[in-house]
Curated annotation (Swiss-Prot):
NADP recorded as keyword: no
Gene: yihI
Top-level lineage group: Bacteria
Region entry Disordered, spans: 1-81
Subunit structure of this chain's protein: Interacts with Der.
GO BP term, example: ribosome biogenesis
Protein name according to UniProt: Der GTPase-activating protein YihI
Family recorded in the similarity comment: Belongs to the YihI family.
Task performed by this protein: A GTPase-activating protein (GAP) that modifies Der/EngA GTPase function. May play a role in ribosome biogenesis.
InterPro entries: YihI
Ranges of Polar residues composition bias in the record: 59-70
Keywords from the UniProt entry: GTPase activation, Ribosome biogenesis
Disulphide linkage map: none
């Protein structure tokens, strides 16, 4: 047989108390009669309930801040900010606006004359000590393929080096030494060393 849980109601055990019922507040005239002890207790309980629930409801801080942020979004100053588009690339910045043209400045021919006044010896040492050129030559020796611009730069620099060598009359000592050693090797009589 299944068990059934017994339940009790409060009214079964004891009758309702006077404190559980909300009594109607009797109208007391202070002149006619003095309030009874029971009326004073009821009045004191009601005042205590009012004092107990004096504070703000829970979470009121969050509600207030949400209301403030919502009102802040609505009240936006139209003068703040600019409607002018900001260019994202440099080339757009350098373009003149409509009707505003910048006159080009003519190049002075004296700049070319100063470059020509550099002595060939100085120019040759500059080319030999050029770090960019040396790095590109190292990459070529390592077997890497250069871009077209880099290859063109290397070719121009090497051509200029050859021109300066011819102009200065510098001969490649390495090539002459190799030729001399080769001739010497070919003409050596091996029988002398026996």
């Amino acid at each position: 047989m299944s068990r059934s849980k017994k339940t009790r109601r409060i009214s079964d055990i004891m009758p309702a108390r006077k404190a559980d019922k909300k009594p109607a507040l009797p109208i007391s005239n202070s002149k006619k009669r003095k309030p009874t002890r029971y009326e004073l207790d009821v009045q004191a309980r009601e005042e205590k309930k009012k004092r107990k629930h004096k504070g703000l409801p829970t979470g009121s801080r969050n509600v207030i801040t949400e209301q403030k942020t919502a009102s802040a979004k609505v009240k936006k100053d139209p003068r703040v900010g600019s409607r002018k588009k900001v260019p994202l690339m440099v080339e757009f910045v350098n373009k003149p606006e409509k009707g505003q043209m910048i006159k080009p400045v003519p190049l002075e021919p004296s700049n070319h004359a100063t470059k020509a006044t550099v002595s060939p010896e100085v120019e040759l040492t500059q080319l030999e000590n050029n770090e960019c050129l040396n790095q590109l030559l190292d990459q070529l020796e390592a077997g890497k393929v250069l871009s077209t611009q880099d290859q063109q730069f290397v070719d121009e620099c090497l051509d200029r080096v050859h021109e300066l060598i011819i102009e200065l009359g510098i001969e490649d000592d390495e090539e002459n030494n190799e030729d001399l050693l080769l001739r010497q090797f070919e003409t050596i009589d091996i029988n002398k060393f026996k």
